[in-house]
């Protein structure tokens, strides 16, 4: 019976994606499934997918990260400023990754070493990064429109390679296995000799790397850096992971599939609701209600990453 339940749970995200796509195809018609809109869906889901894949290890050990959108914005701003000063396009990817990894490392160290709840430490990082971006930009923008945005070939290659890397980490390495074990039972993990602090911090480094790469592609796609960059990304990532089947309590529910399927579901849902004429304010209400319902059925109350671990 337990095996049947587990198999059904694994199938639900895929079935949900098919249902959501079918419903909006019927309601929106060619406006929804036209080539132009499908390309828009892929572009919108790319950042969520990439970041979602990266932070999967954080959620695997029962953590949570509310700072991803703000860290993405800060990384893009610093990279755009560095490019304007140096004039070397290659500096963009270097700076976005270094800035994002540094921010995530700080969040990880504060969470793990100071025993600050991850929701609090990541919110502090969010406020700090947003404050820096707003203070520096002062509602101005930094344009990099002279640089060509990568086509879907390179972007897809990066996504596939990164998804494969995260899959290998989760399935075959100590980093993935130990983070999932920590999410299942942190006390048992410590008792078995796992260096809990080290592997949790490594998870934040992986997440930071993903945010940095996503920031690079996002900056080139938009062609401009503004204070609006990254707003709402954290909730889209969390909702995507949960809709994809990952439990916020962590553990062995953490999979690559969660990030990919969940990202497509949340973006298709948002896009479809807009196409059929649902006001933006109501879309937020719908997303919030769905997120709450899924959370109620997936997390274990005593293990949600709201308390010091």
What are these regions (language model features)?
Residues 13-25, 55, 126, 130-131, ...:
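Hydrophobic core segments of alpha-helical transmembrane domains in multi-pass membrane transport
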Residues 1-23, 164, 184-198, 271-309:
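Cytosolic-side transmembrane-helix boundaries in multi-pass membrane proteins
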Residues 5, 114-175, 201-202, 221-230, ...:
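Transmembrane helix-bundle core of multi-pass membrane transporters
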Residues 211, 226-285:
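Transmembrane alpha-helical segments in multi-pass inner-membrane proteins
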Residues 19-28, 34-85, 114, 241-253:
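Single transmembrane alpha-helix segments in multi-pass membrane proteins
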Residues 88-96, 102-107, 151-226:
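Helix-loop-helix "hairpin" substructures at the membrane interface of multi-pass membrane proteins
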Residues 10-15, 41, 49, 70-71, ...:
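Hydrophobic alpha-helical transmembrane segments
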Residues 86-127, 161, 261-262:
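Alpha-helical transmembrane segments within multi-pass membrane transporters and channels
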């Amino acid at each position: 019976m337990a095996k049947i339940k587990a198999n059904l749970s694994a199938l639900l995200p895929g079935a949900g994606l098919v249902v959501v796509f079918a419903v909006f195809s019927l309601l929106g018609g060619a406006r929804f499934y036209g080539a132009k809109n499908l390309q828009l869906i892929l572009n919108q889901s790319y950042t969520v997918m990439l970041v979602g894949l990266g932070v999967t290890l954080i959620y695997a050990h029962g953590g949570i990260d509310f700072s991803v959108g703000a860290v993405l914005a800060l990384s893009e701003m610093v990279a755009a400023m560095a490019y304007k000063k140096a004039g070397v396009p290659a500096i963009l990817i270097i700076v976005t990754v270094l800035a994002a990894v540094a921010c995530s490392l700080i969040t990880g160290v504060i969470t793990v070493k100071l025993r600050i709840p991850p929701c609090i430490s990541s919110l502090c990082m969010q406020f700090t990064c947003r404050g820096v971006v707003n203070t520096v930009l002062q509602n101005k923008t930094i344009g990099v429109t002279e640089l060509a945005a990568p086509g879907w070939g390179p972007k897809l290659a990066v996504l596939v390679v990164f998804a494969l890397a995260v899959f290998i980490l989760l399935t075959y390495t100590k980093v993935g296995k130990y983070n999932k074990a920590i999410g299942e039972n942190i006390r048992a993990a410590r008792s078995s000799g796992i260096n809990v602090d080290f592997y949790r911090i490594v998870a934040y480094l992986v997440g930071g790397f993903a945010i940095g790469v996503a920031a690079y592609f996002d900056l080139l796609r938009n062609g401009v850096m503004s204070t609006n960059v990254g707003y709402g990304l954290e909730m889209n990532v969390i909702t995507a992971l949960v809709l994809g089947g990952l439990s916020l309590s962590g553990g062995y529910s953490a999979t690559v599939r969660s990030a990919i399927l969940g990202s497509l579901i949340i973006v298709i849902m948002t896009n479809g609701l807009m196409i059929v004429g649902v006001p933006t304010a109501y879309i937020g209400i719908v997303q919030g209600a769905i997120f709450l319902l899924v959370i109620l059925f997936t997390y274990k109350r005593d293990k949600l990453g709201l308390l010091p671990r």
